[in-house]
């Protein structure tokens, strides 16, 4: 009885199965024209798809230049298991051999897919096992909107709006708006309304997935990206001086919003002839917007945010979540900017009235926000001394301007906790006369206008040599070529007045080994031409030879190198020395239209001076790349401070030397009554210290920028005059922290002629300064003059001691007349080089000149222990010399040596000076008596 119903069940299943098999499956696959939008679904969608499916579709566009876009329904369900059994596959073409765009399964719908050509191949496969709901997608022609919404703007002002504004913008837009400004014009962009699709999962600024607006400093995808914006937060005002500002607007297939409306203005920009690169960049004034300020973390109560870190802000400051030297405060300046000083301030809590401040910090800079350089002091990171209380403003001035976009402050030590407010000081590159960027960064110079002697691979071709905007750069075919053999050339399109270049290192490598190289050029030469055939080098006015420019010390940090205006359409840069990783370069050319240039004397360097002066050096990994193979040539590449070489010709030229203008008088050669043996133009100047017998005497110092030579000495040359007898003295001293050393001194009348002085600047682990001290005694009449101080690269060190009488021996007594009137000297030096901070209440710390304690004679710095050591050493040398003389006498007397057997070393008298032997030829005499 029980078997009968069971038999009927099996029979029913059998016949039903045969009935299903007898019905043919609905067809799937085929060729589809995307002229009219349509849908593709898995068989049976949204019900479970059948087993053993193998469907193929080819979707094509009616025109060969059209693309196809696919958008999937969120209800997506295909068996998982790593897409081995059931899957949908999309290929960029018309066959199974085309490039794979995606292979998908699971229950997460694929993102939007866009073809690169006019066809897409779609395949759906299922096996015999578990099934799901399948998929549904919409195909259509991809419309960029370029024909409807892309536009160039050249009028003095105008409005830029999203398509259809104030109605909701369309889907699938990819619009480009470009504002083009004439030379000497600044572009100001202000947003009035901004409403784009918001990403609820957005993590930080610029993290936009659906609809967004990109703003570019130049041509899109060529110039640097200023920012990516979405949601409802209105972008702050933008000011661009590169001549091109672009906006690209992207929308997807989903949500549409009201869009945006913005106005732009073109404002005439006339650079000042005698500008100072020390203006506040906008932290205190608000010109730097809140969106440009960020931090590694923020205190949890939300009352100490990065946006509260503005100098003199009355609402707390920035505090990280944890007090650690790994925390940082970051400012995005949006454009390349010259940074010359940083002012910091602590904060007092409004809730507890407790004071917090940073006592020291490190500085990091970057041009792209990813590759960072720590500001260094020699080989070590520079630690800036900051505040001593919560309200004082401390200003730290950089020795040389840093060209950067992103700035990070990393607190190192603090009181009670980290609290920081700050202001940044500097200027724009284009603030200097005839200093427009001529198109490498912005893209105004096309790829076809950039060429090179050779190229390593297409990834590092000349077109990749654009300043900042390229992440790689130009690499020649041979990374370690001969000096001057490789070159990078820029065609400016029309003749321009060229006044400088900005040079930057590069990132690249060997595609076979996949090892990234961080390369830069240490020294280079520049040539120019009007026709591309006849070339001339930029000349060094002192030697009338091709000028050897200092290059980079880090692969990411750019450096500006200026020269006298030249007419040129073609500019070439020849690498002469480079980093151990080889030659790598990015470039920009500075200048203006040929008719705009005027003969001016200017420099981009700031007039600020401080003890916070450091020359950037390579990072630790770069410094150790060559290991033990580092040669003496690499040591010579250490860059001296800007402004060390100085001829005092122009009042507008702020050489790095500090001096008392009331005592050192700048005098022209034509007006000088002093005799000289050379003829110079009327505008040549020199420094003169003068006194007559009726005066109380004169004492003046001329102080160099800080110098750091940890590995090799260099030769310093200068010209001098000293007249007036024994009451006149001129000496050169090396001054370091807690130490002074006399290097050179003359104290007798040198006659009326100009003479050459040469001194070896010794290698030294610490930073030091070179000080010229001129003294004219009380009741004495005389004159001291100095001119043309420079570092010589063509004088061998063994010839760098002139005159030889100026080099003191160990027991040399310096007869310097005593001077009592030094009051106010330090303040007078500071006034000449101080920044005008009259508009703020900043209290600067430090001084631009050494303290008066260091002005004392170097003899006073010797303590009794050191004197004892010197005395004992001298006694040992004397005993050794006596023994050596007795031994030589015995050898010559009893071995029958003739005078010809004596070594030739006895024909010379060697004198050690800072580790180098100076050789003076003596009269030939017999060393031994003849029997």
Curated annotation (Swiss-Prot):
Which segments constitute the CUB domain?
28-142, 149-267
Q: Subcellular location, in the record's words?
A: Membrane
Fetch the Gene3D superfamilies from UniProt: 2.60.120.200, Galactose-binding domain-like, Spermadhesin, CUB domain
Positions annotated with a glycan in the UniProt record: 152, 157, 629, 839
Signal peptide position in this chain? 1-20
**Which terms under GO biological process does the entry name?**
angiogenesis; axon extension involved in axon guidance; axon guidance; branchiomotor neuron axon guidance; cell adhesion; cellular response to leukemia inhibitory factor; dorsal root ganglion morphogenesis; facial nerve structural organization
**Entry-linked Pfam families:** CUB, DUF3481, F5_F8_type_C, MAM
Name one molecular function that GO assigns to this entry.
metal ion binding
Asked whether the keyword Acetylation is assigned, the reply is no
Q: How does it sit in the membrane?
A: Single-pass type I membrane protein
Q: Transmembrane segments in this chain: where?
A: 865-889
Give positions of region: Disordered.
298-317, 601-622
- Parts of the chain on the Cytoplasmic side: 890-931
Identify the keywords attached in UniProt to this record, alphabetized. Calcium, Developmental protein, Differentiation, Disulfide bond, Glycoprotein, Heparin-binding, Host-virus interaction, Membrane, Metal-binding, Neurogenesis, Receptor, Repeat, Secreted, Signal, Transmembrane, Transmembrane helix
- State where Ca(2+) binds: 197, 211, 252
Compositional bias ranges of the Polar residues kind? 298-310
What InterPro entries does this protein map onto? ConA-like_dom_sf, CUB_dom, FA58C, Galactose-bd-like_sf, MAM_dom, Neuropilin, Neuropilin_C, Neuropilin_MCO_CoagFactor
| All ranges on the Extracellular side of the membrane | 21-864
- The UniProt record lists the keyword Secreted: yes
Annotated disulfide bonds: 28-55, 83-105, 149-175, 208-230, 277-427, 434-592
The family annotation for this protein states: Belongs to the neuropilin family.
Q: What's this protein's function?
A: High affinity receptor for semaphorins 3C, 3F, VEGF-165 and VEGF-145 isoforms of VEGF, and the PLGF-2 isoform of PGF.
Task: Let me see what the UniProt entry remarks about domains.
Answer: The tandem CUB domains mediate binding to semaphorin, while the tandem F5/8 domains are responsible for heparin and VEGF binding.
Share what the entry says about its subunit structure, partners included: Heterodimer with NRP1. Binds PLXNB1.
Q: Indicate what this protein is called per its UniProt record.
A: Neuropilin-2
Which classification does the entry list for the species?
A: Eukaryota, Metazoa, Chordata, Craniata, Vertebrata
């Amino acid at each position: 009885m029980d078997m009968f119903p069971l038999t009927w069940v099996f029979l029913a299943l059998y016949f039903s199965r045969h009935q299903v098999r007898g019905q043919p499956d609905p067809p799937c696959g085929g060729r589809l024209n995307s002229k009219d939008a349509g849908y593709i679904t898995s068989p049976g969608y949204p019900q479970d798809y059948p087993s053993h499916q193998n469907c193929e579709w080819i979707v094509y566009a009616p025109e060969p230049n059209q693309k196809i876009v696919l958008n999937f329904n969120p209800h997506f369900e295909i068996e998982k298991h790593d897409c081995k059994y059931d899957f949908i596959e999309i290929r960029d073409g018309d066959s199974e051999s085309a490039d794979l765009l995606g292979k998908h399964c699971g229950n997460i719908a694929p993102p939007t897919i866009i073809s690169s050509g006019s066809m897409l191949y779609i395949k759906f496969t299922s096996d015999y096992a578990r099934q799901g709901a399948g998929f549904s997608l919409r195909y259509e022609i991809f419309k960029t909107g370029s024909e409807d919404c892309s536009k160039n703007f050249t009028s003095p002002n105008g409005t830029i709006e999203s398509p259809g504004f104030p109605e909701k913008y369309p889907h699938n837009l990819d619009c480009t708006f470009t504002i083009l400004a004439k030379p000497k014009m600044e572009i100001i962009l202000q947003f009035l309304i901004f409403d784009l699709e918001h990403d609820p999962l957005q993590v930080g600024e610029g993290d936009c997935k659906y609809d967004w607006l990109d703003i570019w400093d130049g041509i899109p995808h060529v110039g640097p990206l200023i920012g990516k914006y979405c949601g409802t937060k209105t972008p702050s005002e933008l000011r661009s001086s590169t001549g091109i500002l672009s906006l690209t607007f992207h929308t997807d297939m989903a949500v549409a919003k009201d869009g945006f409306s913005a106005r732009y203005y073109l404002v005439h920009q006339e650079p000042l002839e005698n500008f100072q690169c020390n203006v506040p960049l906008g932290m205190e004034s608000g010109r730097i917007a809140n969106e440009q300020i960020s931090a590694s973390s923020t205190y949890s109560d939300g009352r100490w945010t990065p946006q509260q870190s503005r100098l003199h802000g009355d609402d707390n400051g920035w505090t990280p979540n944890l007090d650690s030297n790994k925390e940082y405060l970051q400012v995005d300046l949006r454009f390349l900017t010259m940074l010359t000083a940083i002012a910091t301030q602590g904060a007092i809590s409004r809730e507890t009235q407790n004071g917090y401040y940073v006592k020291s910090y490190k500085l990091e800079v970057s041009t792209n926000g990813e590759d960072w350089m720590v500001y260094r002091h020699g080989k070590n990171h520079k630690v800036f001394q900051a505040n001593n209380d919560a309200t004082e403003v401390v200003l730290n001035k950089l020795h040389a301007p840093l060209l950067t976009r992103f700035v990070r402050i990393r607190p190192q030590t603090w009181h009670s906790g980290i609290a920081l407010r700050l202001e940044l000081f500097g200027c724009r590159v284009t603030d200097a006369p005839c200093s427009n960027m001529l198109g490498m960064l912005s893209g105004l110079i096309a790829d076809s206008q950039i060429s090179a002697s050779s190229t390593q691979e297409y990834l590092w071709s000349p077109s990749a040599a654009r300043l900042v905007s390229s992440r790689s750069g130009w690499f020649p075919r041979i990374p370690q070529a001969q000096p001057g053999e490789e070159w990078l050339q820029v065609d400016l399109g029309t003749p321009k007045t060229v006044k400088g270049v900005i040079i930057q290192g590069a990132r690249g490598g060997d595609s076979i080994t996949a090892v990234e190289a961080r390369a830069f050029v240490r020294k280079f030469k520049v040539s120019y031409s009007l026709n591309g055939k006849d070339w001339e080098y930029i000349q060094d006015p002192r030697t009338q030879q091709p000028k050897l420019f200092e290059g980079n010390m880090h692969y990411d940090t750019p450096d500006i190198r200026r020269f006298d205006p030249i007419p040129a359409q073609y500019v070439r840069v020849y690498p002469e020395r480079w980093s151990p990783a080889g030659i790598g370069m990015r470039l920009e050319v500075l200048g203006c239209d040929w008719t705009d240039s005027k003969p001016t004397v200017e420099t981009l360097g700031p007039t600020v001076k401080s003890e916070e002066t450091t020359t950037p050096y390579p990072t630790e990994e770069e410094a150790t790349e060559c290991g033990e193979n580092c040669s003496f040539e690499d040591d010579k590449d250490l860059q001296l401070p800007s402004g060390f070489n100085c001829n005092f010709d122009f009042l507008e030229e702020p050489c790095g030397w500090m001096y008392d203008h009331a005592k050192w008088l700048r005098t022209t050669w034509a007006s000088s009554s002093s005799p000289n043996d050379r003829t110079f133009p009327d505008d040549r100047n020199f420094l003169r210290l003068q006194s007559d017998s009726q005066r109380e005497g004169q004492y003046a110092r001329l102080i160099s920028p800080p110098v750091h030579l940890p590995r090799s000495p260099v030769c310093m040359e200068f010209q001098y005059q000293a007249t007036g007898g024994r009451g006149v003295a001129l000496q050169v001293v090396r001054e370091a922290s807690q130490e002074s050393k006399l290097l050179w001194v003359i104290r007798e009348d040198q006659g009326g002629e100009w003479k050459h002085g040469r001194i070896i600047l010794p290698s030294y682990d610490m930073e030091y300064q070179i000080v010229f001290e001129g003294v004219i005694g009380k009741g004495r009449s005389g004159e001291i003059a100095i001119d043309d101080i420079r570092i010589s690269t063509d004088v061998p060190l063994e010839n760098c001691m002139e005159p030889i009488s100026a080099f003191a021996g160990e027991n040399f007594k310096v007869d310097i007349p005593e001077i009592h009137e030094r009051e106010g000297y330090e303040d007078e030096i500071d006034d000449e080089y101080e920044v005008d901070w009259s508009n703020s209440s900043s209290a600067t710390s430090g001084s631009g000149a050494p303290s008066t304690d260091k002005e004392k004679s170097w003899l006073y710095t010797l303590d009794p222990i050191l004197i004892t050591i010197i005395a004992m050493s001298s006694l040992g040398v004397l005993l050794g010399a006596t023994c050596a003389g007795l031994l030589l006498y015995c050898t010559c007397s009893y071995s029958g040596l003739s005078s010809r057997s004596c070594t030739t070393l006895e024909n010379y008298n060697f004198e050690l000076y800072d580790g180098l032997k100076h050789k003076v030829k003596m009269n030939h005499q017999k060393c031994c008596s003849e029997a």
